[in-house]
Design a protein with these regions (language model features):
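Short loop/turn segments at strand-loop or loop-helix junctions that form parts
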Residues: 6-11, 71-73, 126-127, 133-137
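Asp-based phosphoryl-transfer active-site loop
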Residues: 2-19, 40, 68, 191, ...
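Active-site phosphate-binding/coordination module
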Residues: 20-119
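A general structural motif
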Residues: 1-3, 35, 63-65, 127, ...
Length: 245
């Protein structure tokens, strides 16, 4: 294999939104970790990556070859002496977080997308990223898919919030969510940091994701010089991995 590292988005790429990877995906990732380095760079939290992916990998998976980048690359964790260690975390200040949360409340109310009966938290302060979920963090997948099938409501919210927060990066996350990080802290930042710290050049990396459209949280990766593959489901990703093995 000419590639030295394969980087994956999580929701919609390796697994359904907020769901675990399949048994077939877990086996395929274990096989991939045996032959190359793998990075998971997701808008989700460290806990979500651990729950959805790491905890589902078969015993004996080579975790030394696994890099974790939660919150869209704003954090980086690496296995060190049998434990996950934080390499960096680009967190908001309390004042920044307060301003972002205030703008999200105002924008969602203005556009009529604040839910009356949310499934869990609507605004999730993840330290290095703040995520707005239009139906709540724990909404069923079927309801999320039905809420905004053409993505117009989510994209309108993203544009509105971005216009009010020009000093931050605002991107589409999952099917009903938008993600906000510090300016310049996105998945391209994560890829650049990964290259710098692993000494792997961008042309030796393949990125796989389902939000590579402009405004999507995978889109910044396109400008980094890595090869990239747009997928539309975890099933498609599984086929891609098997073809790489």
């Amino acid at each position: 294999m000419g590639l030295k590292l394969i980087a994956f988005d999580l929701d919609g790429t390796l697994a359904p939104s907020k769901g675990p990877i399949s048994c077939e995906m877990a086996k395929a990732l274990k096989s991939l970790l045996d032959i190359t380095q793998v990075c998971i760079i997701s808008g989700g939290t460290e806990q979500q990556i651990m729950s959805q992916v790491v905890s589902k990998l078969p015993a004996g998976a080579n975790l030394r070859n696994l890099h974790l980048m939660p919150t869209s690359g704003a954090r980086y964790l690496k296995r060190h002496f049998g434990r996950w260690r934080t390499v960096y975390s680009e967190d908001f200040t309390p004042a920044q977080a307060e301003r972002i949360i205030s703008v999200l409340h105002v924008s969602a109310a203005l556009l009529g997308v604040w839910p009356d009966n949310p499934y869990g938290e609507v605004i999730d302060n993840r330290g290095s990223q703040i995520t707005f979920s239009a139906l709540g963090q724990d909404a069923p997948l079927e309801e999320k898919e039905a809420w905004d099938p053409d993505k117009s409501r989510r994209d309108q919210l993203r544009r509105t919030v971005a216009s009010m927060l020009p000093e931050f990066d605002v991107r589409s996350g999952g099917s009903t969510s938008i993600d906000i990080t510090r300016l310049g802290i996105d998945k391209s930042y994560g890829i650049y940091e990964l290259c710098k710290r692993t000494h792997i050049s961008p042309d030796s990396i393949l990125f796989v994701g389902d939000r590579l459209e402009p405004g999507g949280n995978d889109f910044p990766v396109i400008g980094t010089g890595v090869d990239f593959q747009h997928v539309f489901s975890p099933e498609e990703t599984l086929v891609l991995i098997r073809n790489l093995l």
